[in-house]
């Protein structure tokens, strides 16, 4: 086991494209860190730099107290699990798991003990004589994890390992990976574009965008207090409703006061349909219902803002508002009719205010 520390890590490709823009990160011994962000944000590049599969332009990567910038991947004491499993098709499950240990010259009794222990942990003991083509996608991913486990590394690296699995199997494997990591107490860094995967797996959540870190924190802290509008819109499904208060002179009233320019945010579950005004300092929005999604235990209501409520147009065209869509999440299956006009309210402590450029969170 080991901690992993990144100090001002940068990656610039020939031609000047800066893929990683000065990342600082510390993953404690035994912690599960998830790098999450959209495609092209640099999360896989950063993971490959930790693994030694990508060179570092500047900065330091420290694993277990040792700077590994110039250390070969095989000597970093890490094990990596890939999206495509990377199994040898002509080898049995046993030999796939034992292959790396044999190459390192490990004694046969030790190899046998490690493979059998990993097979027991992953419940694949009955499959050791099978070839990869005889396995399901979930079973292949277990074998790939077993191959990593037998190395007994200081750090596990996961590069979108569940992307090739169907939705049901993804959920099952996600739970297995978390249980496995807790059981082994091995430091892990995991890359995904799936924010639900990230929220459920992480001790430390690192939200990335355009080669840089937007926010680091526990999943619940990141969800409850997003540092930027990017984080607010990326973490959460449906995403946070974001209302630009500077568009066409639009402002919001809180307790009789009018805000300055910025971006107002509110989570769909923090809006309630009500004809009664909220407590002092809360927010009221008038909406026209445009779509309904019933998904069983909850319903999503999509509405377009209409004049009224606590959003005031104080531009040269009083009474007009940009046609921004608002999403409401309500429990159960009862919902207003499409075309109906409704009022929704939010309590002040559930509101978020960001700077006009979206880069800074402001207290409401």
Curated annotation (Swiss-Prot):
Residues where ATP binds: 37-44
Gene Ontology biological-process entries: carbohydrate transport; glycerophosphodiester transmembrane transport
Domain of life from the UniProt record: Bacteria
GO cellular component: ATP-binding cassette (ABC) transporter complex, substrate-binding subunit-containing
Topology relative to the membrane: Peripheral membrane protein
A single MF term (Gene Ontology): ATP hydrolysis activity
Limits of the ABC transporter domain: 4-235
Alphabetical UniProt keywords: ATP-binding, Cell inner membrane, Cell membrane, Membrane, Nucleotide-binding, Sugar transport, Translocase, Transport
Family matches, as NCBIfam families: PRK11650.1 (NF008653)
Description of how the protein assembles with itself and partners: The complex is composed of two ATP-binding proteins (UgpC), two transmembrane proteins (UgpA and UgpE) and a solute-binding protein (UgpB).
Family per similarity comment: Belongs to the ABC transporter superfamily. sn-glycerol-3-phosphate importer (TC 3.A.1.1.3) family.
Record's protein name: sn-glycerol-3-phosphate import ATP-binding protein UgpC
Lineage: Bacteria, Pseudomonadati, Pseudomonadota, Alphaproteobacteria, Hyphomicrobiales
Gene coding for it: ugpC
């Amino acid at each position: 086991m080991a901690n992993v520390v990144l100090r001002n890590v940068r990656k610039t490709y020939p031609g000047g494209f800066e893929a990683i823009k000065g990342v600082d990160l510390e993953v404690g011994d035994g912690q599960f860190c998830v790098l999450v962000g959209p495609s092209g944000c640099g999360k896989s590049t950063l993971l490959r730099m930790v693994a030694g599969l990508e060179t570092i332009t500047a900065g330091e990567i420290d694993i277990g107290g040792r700077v590994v910038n110039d250390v070969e991947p095989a000597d970093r004491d890490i094990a990596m699990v890939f999206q495509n499993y990377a199994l040898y098709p002509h080898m049995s499950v046993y030999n796939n798991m034992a292959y790396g240990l044999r190459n390192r010259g490990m004694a046969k009794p030790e190899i046998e003990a490690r493979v059998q222990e990993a097979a027991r942990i992953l419940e694949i003991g009955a499959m050791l004589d099978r070839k990869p083509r005889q396995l399901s996608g979930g079973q292949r991913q277990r074998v790939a994890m077993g191959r990593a486990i037998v190395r007994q590394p200081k750090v596990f690296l996961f590069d979108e390992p569940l992307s090739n699995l169907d939705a049901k199997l993804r959920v099952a494997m996600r739970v297995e990976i978390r249980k496995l990591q807790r059981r082994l107490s091995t430091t892990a860094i995991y890359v995904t574009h799936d924010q639900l995967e990230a929220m459920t797996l992480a001790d430390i959540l690192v939200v990335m965008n355009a080669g840089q870190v937007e926010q680091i924190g526990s999943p619940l802290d990141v969800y409850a207090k997003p540092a930027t509008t990017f984080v607010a819109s990326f973490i959460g499904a449906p995403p946070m409703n974001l209302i630009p208060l500077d568009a066409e002179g639009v402002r919001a009233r809180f307790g009789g006061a009018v805000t300055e320019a910025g971006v107002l945010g509110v989570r769909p579950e923090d809006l309630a349909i009500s004809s009664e005004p909220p407590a002092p300092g809360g927010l009221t929005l008038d909406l026209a219902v445009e779509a309904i999604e019933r998904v069983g235990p909850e319903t999503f209501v999509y509405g377009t803002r209409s004049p009224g409520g606590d959003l005031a147009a104080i531009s040269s065209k009083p009474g007009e508002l940009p046609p921004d869509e608002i999403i409401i999440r309500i429990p159960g299956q009862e919902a207003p009719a499409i075309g109906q006009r409704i009022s929704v309210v939010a309590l002040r402590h559930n509101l978020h205010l960001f700077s006009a450029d979206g880069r800074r969170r402001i207290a409401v």
